[in-house]
Swiss-Prot record:
This is Thiosulfate sulfurtransferase GlpE. One of its GO terms (molecular function) is thiosulfate-cyanide sulfurtransferase activity. NCBIfam families: PRK00162.1. Keywords: Cytoplasm, Transferase. It holds the Pfam family Rhodanese. GO terms for biological process: glycerol metabolic process. Transferase that catalyzes the transfer of sulfur from thiosulfate to thiophilic acceptors such as cyanide or dithiols. May function in a CysM-independent thiosulfate assimilation pathway by catalyzing the conversion of thiosulfate to sulfite, which can then be used for L-cysteine biosynthesis.
Amino acid sequence: MDQFECINVEEAHQKLHQGTAVLVDIRDPQSYAMGHTPQAFHLTNDTLGAFMRDHDFDTVVMVMCYHGNSSKGAAQYLLQQGYDAVYSIDGGFDAWHRHFPSEVAFGA
């Protein structure tokens, strides 16, 4: 994959529950604490190194932000770091929360 692709929350949900991809949430700590996908890794400048140590470049990565805009830049960055397959989730956490309100965790 030379460029990231955009996927909707239904596709992301399917990949996550099939175990074929990991989900990273790039929102600020306060927004993340107020609600996030339970399986999400909170990816920040401080946690990037740990994420890269724990996930090989052949790991399929899905990036979630607030509305699906900031995730595009982060997805491109992860591709530039060497990840083979990266997706930006259209609609971000707002769309996830609308479609899957029972699949939201709270706290850090």
